[in-house]
Amino acid sequence: MEPVELITSKAISRDEVITFLLQMGVEREESPHRIWDYVIRRGEAIVWVDPDDVEHYPDPEVDALIENKLGGPPQTYVVLHISRNPGSEQLALELAIQFAKRWPSVLDNLSGLARRIFALDDLQTLYNRGLGLREDAKGVPLPKEWVDAGEEYLAPWQIEELEKQNREFLEIQE
């Protein structure tokens, strides 16, 4: 599952977002095992919707890009959780396009390697070409420090923990 975030410069109530989603074919998820309350399905394609995402972790560079593309500060965030099933990304694009036609919006693909902020025109181009929201990431090589041939990648915190454990082990041996 891959999350993307719809961001609009309009302050939209949760009820208004849900009304729009229901008009677009999104349904309330009734499963007792659900993670999110809303879902849209078409064949194998599935997109879960979190209509009132309240988690926002500031990133000044990305926030400035979003605000610049929106033409104002972000007000409402809606997260689409895209299944990896065939057709799910196109279904998410359709929903995002309709959302962006209704309210001034951008879509953040939340990709760590190739993060992009898409406006309505960008979304329509991707959809018409049959491309996905992470096409850029497919051609981006992993940074060299992440993976060196023949070496296991250890995050800095893992190295620090191993060094700490090694010091403790050596102290016990003495």
Residues of each region from the PLM?
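Acidic, proline/glycine-rich low-complexity IDRs
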Residues: 27, 94-174
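Short, flexible beta-strand-to-coil junctions
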Residues: 9-12, 80-88, 98-101, 110-112
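Short, extreme N-terminal segment that most often corresponds to the first beta-strand
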Residues: 1-41, 168-174
